[in-house]
A protein has these predicted regions:
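N-terminal Rossmann-like dinucleotide-binding module
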Residues: 1-49
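Beta-loop-alpha module in the N-terminal Rossmann-like domain of NAD(P)-dependent dehydrogenases
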Residues: 52-100
Length: 100
């Protein structure tokens, strides 16, 4: 099983990614959206850490990497608007995750 993080959790594409992550037996560890989209996440991953601020999300991913508790992020699923993709790809690379 792999650990995922997701950006743009409240967007149009995110439910497809959430379903695929769940259907393949993987875990969503953290999610980001500037709007409160917990209702969408709860139906798939009720224990997922949810953030509305990018800085807090980024800090959380860094902490997961340093703690070495088996919760490091393997994949960052980017469902945010196109203009944010560059920053989110760089975040994925910095924490050792593959960007989707």
């Amino acid at each position: 099983m792999k650990n995922f993080a997701l950006t743009g959790a409240g967007g149009y594409v995110a439910p497809r990614h959430l379903k695929a992550i769940k259907d393949t037996g993987n875990h969503l560890i953290a999610a980001l959206d500037k709007h409160d989209s917990v209702g969408i996440l709860d139906s798939y991953f009720p224990d997922c850490a949810f953030f509305t601020e990018y800085e807090r999300f980024d800090r959380h991913l860094e902490k997961l990497l340093r703690r070495d508790e088996g919760k490091e992020i393997h994949y960052l699923s980017i469902c945010a608007p196109n203009y944010l993709h560059d920053a989110h790809i760089r975040t994925a690379l910095r924490v050792g995750a593959d960007a989707l």
